[in-house]
Amino acid sequence: MAQQSQFDADVIIVGGGPAGSTLGNLLGTYGVRTLILEREPDIIDYPRAVGMDDEALRAFQTTGLAEPLLKDMIQNTLLRYHHSNGKMFAEVGPKAKPFGWPRRNLFIQPLSEKVIRSGIARFSHITVLTGHEVETFTQDSEGVTLNVK
């Protein structure tokens, strides 16, 4: 017989990668009881993204994670875009900080993801379960039931 567990949460986030963990931090900041279910047992050790802009840093400012994230970033970097033939077609040079944060920032995703995920540990009302994959869910007037393996 399959093991059954019950969690009382206002929000369930399926996926604890950068987006899900960021949402978890935002919900944690506002006191929302949250369950995060992540299929992978740990943070994936290769990057899938490399850049973060000032708008993203504003969201992380809300969670208190902007400064820790900046420690591992190359800030306010010049970006050059090239065609497949090697010819440059655009150059973006960030000069201003209209929102108070550097505009173009390069990062190593696994490092940033560790900061974001560790931020969740500040909140006793957030539960993160890694190595748990949602197979199906049903919703009725009583709530949501997930089948998780």
What residues fall within each predicted segment?
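Active-site-adjacent segment of FAD-dependent monooxygenases/related oxidoreductases
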Residues: 45-121, 129, 135-138
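Beta1/beta-strand and adjacent pyrophosphate-binding region of the FAD-binding site
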Residues: 3-19
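Glycine-rich Rossmann-fold phosphate-binding loop(s) that bind the pyrophosphate
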Residues: 15-18, 39, 109
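Glycine-rich FAD pyrophosphate-binding loop
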Residues: 28-49
